[in-house]
């Protein structure tokens, strides 16, 4: 599946410092140590209600990771899926009397348009689940063969499940205890009460065909992929086992990332005691976005959409700055005051970048690099550029190259355009 056109990224002199990120599994900030090519998998959208600000905040956070790796001199291999067949999509299509494939295609195109407007660097592999059913079938076959999976015999539908007991160190991604797992599993799409399961927490790998639902053939009967195994199979196929960063929103820590890792490690016979034997070497998660102090969610009907902001004439660079005003890991709130402050900040920066000269800027670029490399500390990076722009506006400066350097740095590191 095609992604979207990549924006140009200016090259800054020298190389940025090594990136350090909070690893959700180990619960520490530590250096990310890729080889020449840095590898990243970020879970994509289920294509309905795209693109709300929660989506945008997540993909902007990992856009920073992408940009900082490029600035540090790495090549980047970045894969992202699209969950273009799943219960929520089918339910929305049924509610709205739409063909589910048409709804998915419409929403995927809207997402592409929004990501392009926000100047998000596209993934190199942008993969729909419907394109990848063969990968999932092959993986489920392997899990059945090594007894990490089983077919539920009870009931009308022979669904296939993963045995959590088959995965060494199950639970290392979230750090949850059994009781917390059970609660969150039920809240986020799990089926602990399904008769015939070996363990209530065992996760669905293959949903046997039901009347009126899309299905594909497989050796274990027609059906469609479970949610978690889709990402396991796509990531293993496109960037391989033991990639550098698994990314997503914090609501994916459990069960999604926990089970994606469990499926992959059950296939590979690997454990989590050593980061080099994990599905991903680092698990990185972005916080949730609320609206006016309340949780932003589909169920509450208070989603704010990127496309709606753009239709109102909001500059996408201002949207980036508004979301960068808080730390990516923090749960934070969107309101009109936040957007207004971002628009004012963007105007100040653009004015300073338009001056014929300004204060020397090499130090501010170095500070931006250091702050961003320290677990994507955007508030401090923005403050560094604020200081330079205020000084430039108030007192000028004798460095004729400084405004252009600052504009290139804002573009390369933050994806924010200051000049036409």
From Swiss-Prot:
Known EC number: 6.3.1.13
Keyword Transcription: no
Extent of motif 'ERGGDP' region: 187-192
Keywords, ordered alphabetically: ATP-binding, Ligase, Metal-binding, Nucleotide-binding, Zinc
Cofactor note: Binds 1 zinc ion per subunit.
An annotated GO cellular component: cytosol
Cofactor list: Zn(2+)
Chain residues that bind L-cysteinyl-5'-AMP: 43-46, 58, 81-83, 227, 249-251, 289
Short motif 'KMSKS' region, span: 295-299
Catalytic activity: 1D-myo-inositol 2-amino-2-deoxy-alpha-D-glucopyranoside + L-cysteine + ATP = 1D-myo-inositol 2-(L-cysteinylamino)-2-deoxy-alpha-D-glucopyranoside + AMP + diphosphate + H(+)
Binding site for Zn(2+): 43, 231, 256
TM ranges: none
SUPFAM superfamilies hit by this protein: Nucleotidylyl transferase
Family to which this protein belongs: Belongs to the class-I aminoacyl-tRNA synthetase family. MshC subfamily.
Subunit-level organization: Monomer.
NCBIfam families in UniProt: mycothiol_MshC
Function: Catalyzes the ATP-dependent condensation of GlcN-Ins and L-cysteine to form L-Cys-GlcN-Ins.
The name this protein goes by in its record: L-cysteine:1D-myo-inositol 2-amino-2-deoxy-alpha-D-glucopyranoside ligase
Organism: Segniliparus rotundus (strain ATCC BAA-972 / CDC 1076 / CIP 108378 / DSM 44985 / JCM 13578)
Gene: mshC
């Amino acid at each position: 599946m095609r992604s979207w056109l990549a924006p140009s990224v200016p090259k800054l002199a020298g190389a940025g410092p090594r990136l350090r990120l909070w690893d959700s599994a180990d619960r520490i900030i530590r250096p990310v140590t890729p080889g020449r090519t840095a590898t990243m998998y970020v879970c994509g959208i289920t294509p309905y209600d795209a693109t709300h600000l929660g989506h945008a905040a997540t993909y902007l956070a990992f856009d920073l990771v992408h940009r900082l790796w490029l600035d540090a001199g790495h090549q980047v291999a970045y894969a992202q899926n699209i969950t273009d067949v799943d219960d929520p999509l089918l339910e929305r299509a049924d509610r709205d009397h739409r063909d589910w494939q048409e709804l998915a295609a419409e929403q995927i195109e809207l997402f592409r348009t929004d990501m392009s407007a926000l100047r998000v660097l596209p993934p190199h592999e942008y993969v729909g689940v419907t394109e990848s059913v063969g990968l999932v079938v092959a993986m489920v076959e392997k899990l059945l063969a090594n007894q990490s999976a089983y077919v539920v015999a009870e009931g009308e539908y022979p669904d296939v499940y993963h045995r959590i007991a088959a995965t060494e160190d199950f639970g290392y991604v979230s750090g949850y205890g059994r009781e917390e797992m059970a609660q969150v599993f039920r809240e986020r799409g799990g089926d602990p009460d399904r008769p015939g399961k070996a363990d209530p927490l065992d996760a669905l790998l293959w949903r046997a065909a039901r009347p009126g639902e899309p299905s594909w053939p497989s050796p274990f009967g027609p059906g469609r992929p479970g949610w978690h195994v889709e990402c396991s199979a796509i990531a293993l196929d496109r960037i391989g086992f033991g990639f550098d960063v698994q990314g997503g929103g914090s609501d994916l820590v459990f069960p999604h990332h926990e089970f994606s890792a469990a499926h992959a490690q059950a296939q590979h016979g690997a454990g989590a005691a050593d980061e080099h034997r994990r599905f991903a070497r680092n698990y990185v998660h972005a916080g949730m976005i609320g609206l006016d102090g309340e949780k932003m969610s589909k169920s509450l009907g208070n989603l704010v959409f990127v496309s709606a902001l753009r239709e109102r004439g909001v500059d996408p660079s201002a949207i980036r700055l508004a979301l960068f005003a808080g730390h990516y890991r923090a749960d934070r709130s969107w309101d009109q005051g936040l957007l207004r402050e971002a628009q004012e900040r963007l105007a100040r920066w653009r004015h300073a970048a338009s001056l014929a000269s300004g204060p020397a800027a090499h130090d501010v670029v170095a500070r931006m690099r250091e702050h961003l490399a320290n677990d994507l500390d955007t508030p401090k990076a923005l403050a560094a550029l604020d200081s330079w722009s205020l000084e430039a506006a108030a007192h000028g400066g004798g460095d004729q190259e400084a405004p252009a350097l600052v504009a290139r740095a804002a573009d390369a590191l933050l994806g924010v355009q200051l000049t036409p």
